[in-house]
Amino acid sequence: MGRMGITFLCKGIKHEGVKLSMESFLDTIWNRNLYIGIPLGAFCCSLFLLFCFFHTMRNRTIRGLRLVLTACLIWTGSVSLMRLGIFPGITFWHNFALLGLLMIPVFMYVFLFGFLEITEHDALIYIYGVLTLALVLGNARSGTILPAPELVNRADGTFVYVYHATVGTGVLIAMEIAVMIYATYLAHCKIGTNVELRKKLFPLLLGTVCILGGNLLCMLPGSVFPFDMLGSVGTVSYTHLRAHETCAD
């Protein structure tokens, strides 16, 4: 393989032409490289939560939660495969991860609008979703918005991924923040003075902000820690568990 990758064999793993035992592979994932262990943990967490909603009631709110979890699975799963170097390569999985990441806030608003029965702004969600899909497809073709990260090998045998922001990245971030502020304003107007409801829905906003913040930290020069995934593991779990309690009420 042209890039650092992992090819699964019957008796072990081949990594840059060297066979590794399964024990070494697990050591690489969980003990030596947070860049692999954290996204795999986030993937398992999202998968578990999705299973929890399989036998729940079917309405717009629950469908929104399932869509959020599905987007989380696409994001975390694609990031895991990208960081493992699985075929067809970094760029391919990077674009799938970007799709999952950007669809999380879209589906968050599907849940939020469904729970608060905000129906007069459904067109906003559809437009937002279509624009997001078009943006990801455009980035996959040109790489001008958020290029695939650079793989950097370190002296201790581990590796990190370094993201390089562009002008398009700044425009994307500004758009996401603008939509988040507008959606929060609509929710605020709908909730009014209902303090209990506001407390229950606050984790949704917190989760979206932390996921966005974690990805922004990864864009800082010299940043080599996987803030993107670490910022989402606990927050997304808390968000969905609280949302499940909200729906149960």
Language-model features, listed with the residues they occupy:
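Juxtamembrane membrane-water interface segments of multi-pass membrane proteins
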Residues: 54-55, 115-122, 186-201
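Interfacial "cap-and-anchor" motif at the non-cytosolic start of specific transmembrane alpha-helices
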Residues: 32, 78, 197-248
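Membrane-interfacial helix-loop-helix modules of multi-pass inner-membrane proteins that assemble, modify
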Residues: 141-157
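Alpha-helical transmembrane segments in multipass membrane proteins, preferentially the mid-helix core
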Residues: 48-52, 108-111, 173-193, 241-242
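Methionine residue identity
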Residues: 1-4
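Short, strongly hydrophobic alpha-helical membrane anchors
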Residues: 6-9, 13-30
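Juxtamembrane membrane-water interface segments that cap and precede transmembrane helices
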Residues: 21-28, 152-167
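Individual alpha-helical transmembrane segments in multi-pass integral membrane proteins
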Residues: 29-46, 57-144, 165-178, 227-236
